[in-house]
Amino acid sequence: MKNWTRKEFLQTTAVGGGAALLAGNRVYGQTAPAKGSANGDIRVAVVGLRSQGKGHMLDHATKLPGSRLVAICDVDSAVLAARKADCEKVGVKPTTYSDYRKLLENKDIDAIVIASPNHQHSLQTIWGLQAGKDVYCEKPLSHNVWEGRQAVEAAKKYSKNIVKRARRTAPPRTSTTPSSS
């Protein structure tokens, strides 16, 4: 069995999380089918473009088949400009937004990846669902049970899917070498 480095584990789980979003109801048993655009690609927007968001942005721009990065959003204009340049280096030209509410008006977006600051996750998730988008949200989805329940109720009400990223870590491995006695 291969011993994974932390970096390999994180890369694998990040790509797996994106694949789970793309797979939609086949993985999580939701009642709403995951619908892409007419050409079969799922058109994705990434919100919050610093560390986690940058990784998601580059994954959807270059690594995930069936996923197409169509929009990016960040309130920091310097970060937004830098990420737009990163996308253009790999041949992707997403629409840019500094206002999340304007992004939600774009009917060409099928799914949203939320990697904004934690305190914005619940409301941005609910707004995304209300706008008819499936949502993949970095942890934490909410700061308390009530917020989490509101997001789940919104997913049911609008027949959309939520995928929340969760990392599980295993306890350190211990050697059980038999004693020589």
Regions found by a protein language model. Give the residues of each.
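N-terminal glycine-/serine-/threonine-rich beta1-alpha1-beta2 phosphate-ribose binding loop
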Residues: M1-C137, R149-I162
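A contiguous active-site-proximal alpha/beta segment in oxidoreductase catalytic domains
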Residues: D134-Y136, S142-S181
